[in-house]
Amino acid sequence: MESMSELAPRCLLFPLLLLLPLLLLPAPKLGPSPAGAEETDWVRLPSKCEVCKYVAVELKSAFEETGKTKEVIDTGYGILDGKGSGVKYTKSDLRLIEVTETICKRLLDYSLHKERTGSNRFAKGMSETFETLHNLVHKGVKVVMDIPYELWNETSAEVADLKKQCDVLVEEFEEVIEDWYRNHQEEDLTEFLCANHVLKGKDTSCLAERWSGKKGDIASLGGKKSKKKRSGVKGSSSGSSKQRKELGGLGEDANAEEEEGVQKASPLPHSPPDEL
């Protein structure tokens, strides 16, 4: 009979042979679960192109707003003559600092418009979807959604990430923005900052995307209404002026007739000379 010491290696080898097929199976892929993939598809974070596009848009707007003042900043007093030297605020470092420090907070005014495509999904104002839902609620319709009503106006994950990426971009390309401010303001900021630096050699297609509106859009309807009002006012003014002319003409005719009547009645007939 075989001793126990000889049987021990065989006993250990048998379980290893059973586990061998499991060890040869391919390792599971690391990544999100199917549910996680659906959530990722639903929440599509902004691309670098989208971030740079709206950073440039807000920089242009902020520089335009702060460029209307004629304020002069006193930079201190001279050592010898005691006279202070000044610099225009529009060309000062203070203006550049104030704009760049607050620029990313302006992106929190944006909303996510899921009904739009491309980079146009980011825009200021309430999206058409939520505007419709708000109108239904105000009319007394019960709207059931996964998101509580109190959170409808909260900042979306996409917009929050837009602001977060903006902070990183402005810090990383601070010198480029400063160079444009001091030396290249005649060049388009979107082209200078995004196409030539931030997105150099990368996809820049979103920079050319423009939202032209569509049928039923509030903005376009408002523009048409205002034009109609203006044309109506113009028509009424032209009509009133025409009426005034007609009335004026009638008045002139009446006055002319009155004057003719006065002139006709004024000459007295000459009485024949009295005969002596």
From Swiss-Prot:
GO biological process: innate immune response
Domain Saposin B-type residue range list: 47-269
Taxonomic superkingdom: Eukaryota
Keyword field: Chaperone, Coiled coil, Disulfide bond, Endoplasmic reticulum, Glycoprotein, Immunity, Innate immunity, Signal
Glycosylation sites noted in the Swiss-Prot or TrEMBL record: 153
Coiled-coil region: 153-179
Signal peptide positions (record): 1-26
Keyword Ribosomal protein carried by entry: no
Subcellular location: Endoplasmic reticulum
InterPro entries: DUF3456
Disulphide bonds in the chain: 49-206, 52-194, 104-166
Span list, region Disordered: 218-276
Main location class: endoplasmic reticulum
UniProt keyword Transferase, yes or no: no
Effect of a null allele: The birth rate of knockout mice on a C57BL/6 background is very low (approximately 10% of pups). The animals appear normal, but their growth after birth is severely retarded. Half of them die by the end of the weaning period. Mutant mice have profoundly impaired T-helper type 1 lymphocyte (Th1)-mediated responses. On a BALB/c background, under resting conditions, they show spastic or dystonic features and, during the open field test, they exhibit hyperactivity and anxiety. Their resting electroencephalography show enhanced activity in the fast beta frequency band (20-35 Hz).
Gene Ontology cellular component annotations, sorted alphabetically: endoplasmic reticulum
Gene Ontology MF terms in the entry: signaling receptor binding
Complex and partners: Interacts with HSP90B1; this interaction is disrupted in the presence of ATP. Interacts with TLR1, TLR2, TLR4 and TLR9. Strongest interaction with TLR4.
Purpose of the protein: Toll-like receptor (TLR)-specific co-chaperone for HSP90B1. Required for proper TLR folding, except that of TLR3, and hence controls TLR exit from the endoplasmic reticulum. Consequently, required for both innate and adaptive immune responses.
Family: Belongs to the canopy family.
Protein name as it appears in the record: Protein canopy homolog 3
GN (gene name): Cnpy3
